[in-house]
């Protein structure tokens, strides 16, 4: 009986030691999965823009309970306010199937939401929450801006758990995504 209690105590101690690292392992695997889905969605958006012969917009959002992004098209008009389709923004916080509700001329293609409880977030790396894929070139498109300076040449998106466990997906001007990460072991991508 004493031997059994010693074995149970040893197993309990080993479980307490292994549980935190197992939780960390699960979070990193979830991060890898979310980033893989993000890259796939960006490639899908690029090909959809070309196949639909229409800009395909990508818009990001966040609140306390989630981060999200939505892919959508907008019927471009000749009115000055919507010449490039840039004044209509679907809201991924509304949820899949409802992100473009009430947005004139907008058609939702895909919406992804990540609950804050999952510990993984997806958000733009810098200011700005949207861009489009051009249907002619397959490259990225930014609507004209009145701000001074050269136009952006890429759009970077972070998929992260924390500052030490982050993937950065960069959509280059050509529309192709590339992925790098921080120096954390186990991420398996080049260091940014």
Residue ranges and their predicted role:
Residues 1-27, 41:
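N-terminal single-pass transmembrane signal-anchor helix
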Residues 17-31, 36, 47, 55, ...:
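N-terminal helix-rich module
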